[in-house]
Amino acid sequence: MKDLVPAWIDGALRPVGKLEAHQRGLRHKAVSVFVMRGPETLIQRRALDKYHTPGLWANTCCTHPLWDESPADCAVRRLREELGITGLYPAHRDRIEYRADVGNGLIEHEVVDLFIAEAPANLKVAPNPEEVAEVKWVDLYELNAQVKRRPERYTPWLRIYLAEHSERIFGTVATS
């Protein structure tokens, strides 16, 4: 059931096409991963041909589990597919819900399983150009300051995570 994500319709979880979920603003499952290196987090700039939020900076990895996939398996799979990261098994941190307009008539209404992992010193990152335009490591406090200065450069969900859920994700408040 590739490209079918778990979404709630009339109170029941059903497989729905990812684009349809965004067009209809359906509440659906998602996964977000933050890979850390001490006080820094790895962020990605989304590929320019993504159908929503192209070219914007996001957390390490943000995606939707397949219909029959666990959030933990999804996190590992998408780290590999988007960033070429293998051998890293992020820990489940929390679950949050948000709703955001992502442009072009599309809505993200996600119930997100949040994962976090500490990068080993020898972590190799090889971004898939179909998914990721570039990556960089950035200090969490500096990232928060950058998001406040230029919010239009960042995805709505990253802005929400930092502003409203920092302590739940990182165990600290990401303030500048």
From Swiss-Prot:
Coiled-coil region list: none
EC number, UniProt record: 5.3.3.2
Keywords, sorted A to Z: Chlorophyll biosynthesis, Cytoplasm, Isomerase, Isoprene biosynthesis, Magnesium, Manganese, Metal-binding, Photosynthesis
Gene of this entry: idi
Family label: Belongs to the IPP isomerase type 1 family.
GO biological process, one term: dimethylallyl diphosphate biosynthetic process
NCBIfam families: IPP_isom_1 (TIGR02150), PRK03759.1 (NF002995)
Localization per Swiss-Prot or TrEMBL: Cytoplasm
Class in the EC hierarchy, top level: isomerase
Role: Catalyzes the 1,3-allylic rearrangement of the homoallylic substrate isopentenyl (IPP) to its highly electrophilic allylic isomer, dimethylallyl diphosphate (DMAPP).
Species the sequence originates in: Dinoroseobacter shibae (strain DSM 16493 / NCIMB 14021 / DFL 12)
Lineage: Bacteria, Pseudomonadati, Pseudomonadota, Alphaproteobacteria, Rhodobacterales
Signal peptide positions on this chain: none
Protein known as: Isopentenyl-diphosphate Delta-isomerase
Gene Ontology terms: cellular component: cytoplasm
HAMAP family: Idi
Binding site for Mg(2+): 82
Alphabetized GO MF terms: isopentenyl-diphosphate delta-isomerase activity; metal ion binding
Amino acids binding Mn(2+): 22, 28, 64, 108, 110
